[in-house]
């Protein structure tokens, strides 16, 4: 009965002090490590570094970090994620250790270093002027295509064949069988006879005879 009264008092004070506050101002010095043994396996445990997450025992000796839905925070007293209006900061690890098997370890909070402003003095810079050496134009070479020398073709003149008839032998050789110029030539007719005698005419027409008498046939 006494423990129930103490829990009710803690809930009332926490709800009165932190109701409607999503960012808790409670200063936690330690965080818990749950071995997930015994009845602790059915309990959801707070993560003091980030109330958007919590620990759940998926099996004996194996806690797993779970995420709350967006814009919700884990409330240990309700064992669920709630909105800002119903958020209640979790009790300290030392308080939970009195009734559970959790272990408390020192909480190392990340420190945020203050931003440092570095003053920089612009140094005077002297512009460096570089003079480019004069460029010598490179003579351009014009390549011209020279026509190939052509060799004129020489045409050979056609061969001329000369037939030389042998000249008759001259001199004092033996006599040949050449015709003698003393033989007289045959006579040549002065007029060709183109008239031939006309053949005789047709024989005279034979005399005509009278019509023969008709033959009378005798009847038996």
UniProtKB/Swiss-Prot annotation:
Give the coiled coil ranges.
none
| Domain named Chitin-binding type-2: residues | 33-95
Asked if the record carries the keyword Hydrolase, the reply is no
Q: Where is the composition biased (Low complexity)?
A: 116-165
Q: Sugar-bearing residues?
A: 29
Span of the secretion signal?
1-19
Q: What are the disulphide bonds in this sequence?
A: 68-84
Where is it found, in Gene Ontology cellular component terms?
extracellular region
Where is it expressed, tissue-wise?
Answer: Larval peritrophic membrane.
Q: Where is the composition biased (Pro residues)?
A: 197-210
A single Gene Ontology molecular function, please?
A: chitin binding
Q: Which InterPro entries match?
A: Chitin-bd_dom, Chitin-bd_dom_sf
Q: What does this protein do?
A: May bind oligosaccharide structures.
**What is the protein named?**
Peritrophin-55
């Amino acid at each position: 009965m006494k423990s129930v009264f103490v829990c009710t008092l803690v809930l009332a004070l926490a709800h009165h002090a932190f109701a409607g506050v999503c960012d808790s101002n409670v200063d936690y010095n330690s965080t818990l490590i749950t071995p997930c043994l015994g009845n602790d396996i059915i309990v959801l445990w707070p993560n003091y570094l980030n109330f958007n997450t919590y620990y759940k025992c998926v099996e004996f000796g194996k806690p797993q970090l779970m995420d709350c839905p967006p814009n919700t925070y884990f409330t240990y007293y309700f064992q669920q994620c709630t909105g800002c209006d119903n958020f209640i900061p979790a009790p300290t690890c030392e308080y939970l250790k009195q009734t559970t098997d959790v272990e408390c370890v020192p909480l190392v909070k990340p420190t945020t270093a203050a931003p440092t402003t570095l003053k920089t003095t612009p140094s005077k810079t002297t512009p460096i002027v570089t003079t480019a050496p004069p460029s010598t134009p490179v003579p351009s070479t014009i390549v011209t295509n020279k026509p190939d020398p052509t060799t004129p073709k020489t045409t050979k003149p056609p061969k001329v064949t000369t037939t030389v008839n042998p000249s008759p032998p001259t001199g004092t050789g033996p006599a040949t069988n050449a015709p003698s110029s003393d033989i007289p030539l045959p006579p040549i007719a002065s007029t060709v006879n183109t008239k031939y005698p006309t053949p005789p005419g047709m024989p005279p027409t034979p005399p005509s005879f009278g019509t023969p008498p008709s033959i009378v046939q005798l009847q038996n």
